């Protein structure tokens, strides 16, 4: 995938870039793997805003992705590489030998016509799914399970991967995209390779309207609000807020750690950078 630049026909267009979508091979998704997707506008069941700066955006349909890869020992041929509006990665339509079709995350290097399989005897090549026990040290993997059979939860965004750093007992040490080193059961499943669409991080939005297409609403600074709305609000004329930066609920921000200690902390060998 390459990055496409535009002629500066307007201020918003000047620095805008986008993906060239050259890797996309199908215009429409597989109908049997598409579901309706309702928007919440950031509201919960009581109608209250629980997620600020969310709403609007282009209509989407949800593509059902196979994160579990539980269809073992049956080879699947890649029929197409497709765009998915619900994630940064591309998705691949896998047609299994028994006739079933499923979407999987498209790893870097996967092409139409390639054959992938979920098996303990599978080759170590992009798109094949194995338990971590069967994958050599130093291999890049994505779509990694944290609980056996639950489905992949780690390293699913465009361009991400984790590296298998060590194995000891029933656990393996994985170096995650955040820099965190974490213990994961060796019987958990992972897919070989790096998630595709690696240039996604280099796309520049360019203008506010493009964020609105993505369902993102504007953010107002706390110092521009009234005291009733934010701890930084109010003051005569322009003010700096008068205190260390905090959230609208008074919790320190910009570096303040808010992660709560929990039972799974013992599986973290080294914290993220």
Swiss-Prot record:
Region of interest (Disordered), residue spans: 213-261
An annotated GO BP: cytoplasmic translation
Keywords: Ribonucleoprotein, Ribosomal protein, RNA-binding, rRNA-binding
Cleavable signal peptide: none
UniProt GO cellular component terms: large ribosomal subunit
GO molecular function, one term: structural constituent of ribosome
Family: Belongs to the universal ribosomal protein uL2 family.
Purpose of the protein: One of the primary rRNA binding proteins. Required for association of the 30S and 50S subunits to form the 70S ribosome, for tRNA binding and peptide bond formation. It has been suggested to have peptidyltransferase activity; this is somewhat controversial. Makes several contacts with the 16S rRNA in the 70S ribosome.
Subunit structure: Part of the 50S ribosomal subunit. Forms a bridge to the 30S subunit in the 70S ribosome.
HAMAP family linked to this entry: Ribosomal_uL2_B
Designated name of the protein: Large ribosomal subunit protein uL2
Organism (species): Syntrophotalea carbinolica (strain DSM 2380 / NBRC 103641 / GraBd1)
Encoding gene (name): rplB
